[in-house]
Amino acid sequence: PGAVLTDVGSVKQSVIDAVGPHVPEGVHFIPGHPLAGTEHSGPESGFATLFRDRWWLLTPLPGTDEAAQARLLALIRGMGARTDTMDPAHHDLVLAVTSHAPHLIAYTMVGVADHLSRVTETEVINYSAAGFRDFTRIAASDPTMWRDVFLHNREATLDILGRFTEELFMLQRAIRMGDGPLLHDYFGRTRAIRRGIIDAGQDTAAPDFGRAQRADGKPDG
């Protein structure tokens, strides 16, 4: 009794539905999600600054014990993370935008390159420009984990993919019609959003997504 139970999964509502009914009386279940990590998995992929200045979201349930939540927050902040709280369903929608859909799109882009018969696998590997390398880096992520993420955050992911498809069709029409002003305006607006991510301290303007490689091969920061 009095123990605090949390998790670090990328989907919250399904975890609450699955775990919540089985939490023993007196145990404080406070779901969480650190927005940190790389495309690599397992304990060997950890490093000392993994959580430094990264957001760690908590999705506490109604009636969560304030003292228990304070203890968990102290632990998280002690690892250098920033904290915030969020409704579980809203968390899943936000992460569908910022993480889940981007991973699925990255997997798809690699799949397109793999199935394009006029471009060989060797050419894709040898001549990858920075855009392809940077954009598809996350396609190296663990397939088992991401299969489960998509299946357990199905509705939010499908919602965002539908919106993405509409935007893509709009850009497709603009390119087909030679609508340069529309493209320039669109890219300008989205560029400003990207700069906002840097200004918020969630990345840097340095190459390689702001993760310079250290001598041991792990990302620095």
Summary of predicted features, one role per range:
Residues 1-44:
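Rossmann-like NAD(P)(H) cofactor-binding subdomain of soluble oxidoreductases
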Residues 167-168, 172-221:
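NAD(P)-dependent dehydrogenase/reductase Rossmann-like domain
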Residues 12, 33-39, 62-63, 89-90, ...:
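Glycine-rich beta-alpha junction loops
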Residues 20, 47, 73-78, 189:
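Short, solvent-exposed amphipathic alpha-helical segments in soluble enzyme
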